[in-house]
């Protein structure tokens, strides 16, 4: 089965409305208000859609989040059963401080086709390569770079890698620098970071490192439409993380998840820019309109494009 084409516009609208709502808080130094505004707008729009939706990636578990929590049902409760993964405001600090990279993100798949990830860290690696064997979480940094360079018929110093700029990545960053790999260090936003491998125009050959598990699922949802390779392994820092994972049905705590184990079947992904970023531009005002850009993918229709939208300010 596949998702009806009508859902492209419906979920595009959801992403845009969440982005527009949080835009009012850009630069106001209040990341909580910016996030809440995006959450409220996204939830309201989702509840208008003729579907039986269930949140599998959201703002946390029921005891942590009043809205868009894991397991929450959304929609009119008629129509197809869908899994929904959301990050109404990726880059809360970016929005609060008017820095590049704030996004509103949603991914949708048919029921039971989207992995419900625990709120924990995930070690990730992705590249625009066709299959296993070229890069792998269990390979050394040197082997991953060497294999990727061979596959792309390049020298290691011609490759570019994207990684979150965190103390935990100090050793990896040093190894990449020793190999003369070009580095793009990002301060936050590992959904958009992973997406940079999707198209050669972004000039990023590999994304690697430890970031959020839910963000890994969202990134995989988009990369699936681009036939990219993605692999992730959850990292559990304490017993509470382990118990949460087991409660969600994760028995093998050391398992490496491939893209087709995170998302299967058809899917739609939307990411709307709030502030300027590498993938999409931020919201601008022209005359009496908000102008926004959204990356949208729909796997079954082979839709992969950036859509520019216009919304009247008084809407």
Q: Could you say what each language-model-derived stretch is?
A:
Residues 1-85, 146, 150-152, 177, ...:
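N-terminal subdomain of lithium-sensitive/metallo-dependent phosphomonoesterases centered on the IMPase/IPPase/PAP
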Residues 7, 196-315:
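Oxyanion/phosphate-interacting regions
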Residues 55-59, 84-86, 95-97, 116-117, ...:
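General beta-strand structural signal in soluble alpha/beta enzymes
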Residues 67-69, 97-99, 117-120, 172-177, ...:
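Short acidic, glycine/serine/threonine-rich loops at helix termini
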Residues 79-90, 94-115:
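DPxDG-like acidic metal-binding loop motif
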Residues 105, 110-185, 277-284, 288-314:
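Acidic beta-strand-loop-alpha-helix segment within the catalytic core
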Residues 176-183, 191, 195-197, 204:
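Glycine-rich ThDP/TPP pyrophosphate-binding loop and its adjacent helix/strand module
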């Amino acid at each position: 089965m596949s998702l009806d084409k009508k859902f492209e516009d419906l979920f595009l609208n959801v992403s845009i409305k969440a982005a527009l709502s949080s835009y009012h808080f850009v630069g106001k130094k209040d990341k909580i208000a910016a996030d809440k505004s995006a959450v409220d707008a996204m939830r309201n729009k989702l509840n208008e859609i003729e579907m039986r939706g269930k949140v599998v990636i959201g703002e946390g578990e029921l005891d942590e989040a009043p809205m868009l929590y894991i397991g929450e049902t959304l929609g009119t409760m008629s129509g197809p059963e869908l899994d929904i993964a959301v990050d109404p405001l990726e880059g809360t600090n970016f929005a609060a401080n008017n820095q590049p990279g704030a996004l509103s993100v949603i991914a949708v798949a048919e029921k039971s086709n989207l992995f419900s990830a625990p709120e924990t860290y995930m070690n990730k690696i992705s590249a625009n390569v066709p299959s296993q064997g070229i890069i792998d979480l269990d390979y050394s940094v040197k082997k991953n770079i060497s294999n990727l360079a061979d596959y792309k018929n390049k020298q290691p110093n011609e490759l570019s890698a994207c990684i979150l700029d965190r103390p935990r990545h100090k050793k990896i960053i040093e190894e990449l620098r020793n190999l003369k790999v070009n580095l793009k260090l990002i301060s936050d936003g590992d959904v958009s970071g992973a997406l940079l491998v999707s198209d050669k125009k972004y000039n990023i050959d590999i994304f690697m490192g430890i970031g959020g598990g839910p963000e890994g699922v969202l990134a995989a949802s988009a990369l699936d439409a681009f036939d990219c390779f993605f692999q992730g392994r959850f990292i559990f820092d304490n017993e509470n993380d382990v118990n949460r994972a087991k409660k969600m049905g994760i028995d093998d705590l050391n398992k490496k998840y491939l893209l087709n184990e995170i998302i299967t079947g058809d899917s739609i992904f939307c990411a709307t820019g709030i502030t300027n970023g590498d993938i999409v531009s931020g919201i601008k005002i022209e005359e009496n309109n908000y102008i926004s850009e959204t990356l949208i993918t729909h796997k079954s229709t082979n839709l992969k494009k950036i859509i520019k939208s216009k919304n009247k300010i008084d809407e």
